[in-house]
């Protein structure tokens, strides 16, 4: 495994069933669905794979992809952030990795700095990168449902991300589980 991906072994945060069910209910049926950090498939448990024309899931861990047993799913053993994707999605559901970019390799940080100009420098979290990349793959009338820490709502380092989200009118609803 690449050196910069070793840090991802420390950031597994699984989605509770109750939240996964709520998230899946917010998606619209049909079209293409993306899950960019599938992990053990918690977010897919409440999704009928036959309700979608195509489902793509990504993870860097083969052991997680091996646990996904639903039909009609394209499994990609790849780093979602660094993978070029030439399609757009009607639905995106995600629980991205939560890891400070400063804890990643210098090469990985440089890749992010070069390819994600919407981010400020400083204490940036990898989940910011996942949000931006997912939004770039979302169709204009698409739905993205994400569970994240609420830190991007107030962290100084997330100012550029907040402006990006608000300027492009990406936020329809926020549910805060404090």
PLM regions with names:
Residues 4, 8-26, 34-72, 80-178:
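Signature of N6-adenine DNA methyltransferases within the class I
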Residues 77:
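Conserved residues in the N-terminal Rossmann fold of short-chain dehydrogenase/reductase
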Residues 31:
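Nucleotide donor/acceptor-binding cores
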């Amino acid at each position: 495994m690449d050196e910069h991906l070793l840090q991802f072994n420390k950031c597994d945060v699984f989605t509770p069933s109750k939240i996964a069910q709520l998230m899946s209910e917010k998606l619209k049926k049909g079209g293409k669905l993306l899950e960019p950090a599938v992990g053990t498939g918690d977010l897919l448990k409440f999704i009928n794979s036959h309700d979608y024309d195509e489902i793509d899931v990504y993870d860097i861990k083969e052991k997680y992809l091996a646990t996904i047993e639903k039909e009609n799913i394209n499994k990609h053993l790849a780093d979602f952030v660094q993978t070029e994707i030439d399609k757009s999605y009607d639905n995106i559901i995600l629980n991205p990795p939560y890891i400070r970019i400063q804890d990643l390799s210098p090469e990985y940080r440089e890749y992010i700095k070069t390819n994600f100009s919407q981010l400020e420098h400083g204490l940036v979290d990898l989940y910011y990168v996942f949000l931006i990349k997912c939004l770039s793959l979302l169709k204009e009338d698409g739905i993205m449902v994400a569970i994240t820490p609420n830190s991007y709502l107030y962290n100084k380092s997330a100012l550029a991300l907040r402006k990006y989200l608000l300027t492009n009118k990406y936020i329809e609803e926020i549910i805060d589980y404090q």
